[in-house]
Amino acid sequence: MKSFILSNILLGLAAAVPQYGDLSGPPKRFTIRNVSLIGSGCPSGTAHVQVDRSGTIFEASFSAYQVQTGPTVPASEWRKNCKLSLNLDYDPGFQFRLVGTDMSGFASIPDGIGGQCVNSFSFAGDNGDRIEYIVRFQGRNSGRFDLHSTPGLSSWSSCESNTSILNLNTACELEPSNHRALIAVDEVSGKLTVKCAIQWQRCLK
């Protein structure tokens, strides 16, 4: 299984660069047929996914996502995840890839405590290849966070079909501690949000 990981610095990847078709705007039709989800961070009815009108951004938001530590907090609360499978439908002759993510939420972490959130993406049937965006918290953090990441390399969806199943897994964790720490939804919006930018191109005939 290949894993392309991005942290605070961009990792260079030694790989042959394949030839693609012309980069273009999005297809006229780009919709989410359905979404299935599972995980401790997204109880039923607390996750929502939408595509913006431009067809170049989709957003996953979670309204009950909370990771915490403290003197009476059980170990099950130190780490949470939510895995979504998005069945995407669009006009034939196009393919897309992810070119960046913005993650926003709330963190309250004291000195000496570390934490991180990992957003991993893969296409169903893509030989296990995936890309991971990692947001790390180290030392004192208090308040809203809004962090942007861009990949060094990412996979394109297949040209063999005008549908794709994109898997997204959001996993956040804190180091075990008796000190109170928290990664959770933003206090204003009431959501922890992962916003993804999409690049489209026409398939080679």
Which positions does each model-derived feature cover?
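Short, surface-exposed tryptophan/glycine-enriched loops
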Residues: 131-164
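Proprotein-processing/basic-patch segments
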Residues: 174-205
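Internal, hydrophobic beta-strand segments that form the core of beta-sheet-rich folds
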Residues: 160-177
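Generic short beta-strand segments
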Residues: 61-69, 102-104, 169-174
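Fungal secretory targeting signals
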Residues: 1-18
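Extracellular-facing segments of soluble proteins and assemblies that are Gly/Ser/Thr-biased and enriched
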Residues: 78-125
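N-terminal leader/pro-regions and domain N-caps
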Residues: 17-73
